[in-house]
Curated annotation (Swiss-Prot):
The gene is ACOT13. It comes from Homo sapiens. This is Acyl-coenzyme A thioesterase 13. Keywords: Acetylation, Cytoplasm, Cytoskeleton, Hydrolase, Lipid metabolism, Metal-binding, Mitochondrion, Nucleus. The lineage of its organism: Eukaryota, Metazoa, Chordata, Craniata, Vertebrata. Belongs to the thioesterase PaaI family. SUPFAM superfamilies: Thioesterase/thiol ester dehydrase-isomerase. It comes from the Eukaryota. Changing residue 83 to A: Reduced acyl-CoA hydrolase activity. Catalyzes the hydrolysis of acyl-CoAs into free fatty acids and coenzyme A (CoASH), regulating their respective intracellular levels. Has acyl-CoA thioesterase activity towards medium (C12) and long-chain (C18) fatty acyl-CoA substrates. Can also hydrolyze 3-hydroxyphenylacetyl-CoA and 3,4-dihydroxyphenylacetyl-CoA (in vitro). May play a role in controlling adaptive thermogenesis. Substrate binds at residues 50, 81.
Amino acid sequence: MTSMTQSLREVIKAMTKARNFERVLGKITLVSAAPGKVICEMKVEEEHTNAIGTLHGGLTATLVDNISTMALLCTERGAPGVSVDMNITYMSPAKLGEDIVITAHVLKQGKTLAFTSVDLTNKATGKLIAQGRHTKHLGN
């Protein structure tokens, strides 16, 4: 296990103990971490669903936000930044009990801005559930 992977596992472990909103991410599992790329998995459980039993759109946005930030932490700069813009396109539902894969890539990291892309897919079928783009300000 790389130190990058171990560091992110510590971050996820802290989320499971959080008393704030971050605790909703306590059920994600880190699959791999490489420079500018993070892959996580999560089973859709009842606490993750909306009234019709599918993955809640707000949780999808939270996954895009946080997993893309983890990908930024896995760069040489290692800066999480702050959100400037986030866009999510919802393409198909993830149902209760299904396993999803969340793959985040850093597309470009400049002096002050970083651009990331996140795909949420159904683990069994590979079907695209949602795709997000996240722009973050990295500071000076």
